[in-house]
Amino acid sequence: MRTIPPAVAVFLVLAGYASTPAAWGHRPIQAAENSQYRLVENWVHFPPEVTKWGQATGVDVDSHDNVFVFHRNELMPIMAFDTHGNFIRAWGRGMFKTTHFLRVDRSDAIWVTDRGYMEAFKFNREGTLLLTLGKQDVLGDNTSHDTFNGMADLAVTKNGDIFVADGEGPNTRVAKFAKDGAFIKWWGGKGTEPGQFNMPHSIAVDSRDRIYVADRSNNRVQMFDKDGKFLNQWTNVGVPWGLFIKGDLMYLVDGSDNNCLLVMSLKDGRILDKVTGLSNPTAVAVDSTGAIYVGEVNGTNVRKFIKTKS
């Protein structure tokens, strides 16, 4: 069993994996101009042990607007900060191989995915390990019940069901598990038809437990019900790397040539706002005030944006 070092105070940013630029593709985006959001400079206060971000692949917020980041730093890969950027704690030293996404569920449990070891981990806010999905360095296929080969991201529904985007690798599926980690089903397979995937890289769930999948190399977001039935797709999203849903809005980052953040209507997929000039954005999260946090890989940064006008 893996031993976790004691938690160390720090803000948590979730960092993500970047493939080669040639593989990212380019899909121009038509979007709203004159963004309502502005960058907040120097928003975070680092502890002495870590003075800058590593590649930031995962970020999310809890019910108290504390920010958690998963980034590529051996000493403090998971860091937590309060809404003012003050360091709280950190944990995970020596535990991960290739940090990827981070999610906070409705109970404020912290989930992270490791694309290297092909595992996902659930922690409480103090850093105690509660659950593991997958087996370290054991690779599965699309039909596997307890192993992965493309562990990318996950989402948790209101009843605790876990949906894993197992797609950054040979696998091309969404796998569904019960809250205790018991396998339920999978769907997908490689292809371009509705319900098929070509790198399902990120996954999110809305208030009605509908599942949204960033089908990255197919340049679309697909929507499903909780049983995997295809509902709809959006193709106006560029190359979707990371998704986050809050209320009736979807926040999507395109980490390829567009290097942007999109704010979209969940009702019809319309683009309402666009933030450009990012550097390989991979993860995005939004707090209760509407502040947006974006984790960048090439930029090795976690950027904070606030709304300046309605």
Regions flagged by a language model, labelled:
Residues 7-17:
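Bacterial N-terminal signal peptides
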Residues 19-310:
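Eukaryotic scaffold repeat domains enriched in small/polar residues
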Residues 1-5:
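Positively charged n-region of N-terminal signal peptides that target proteins for export
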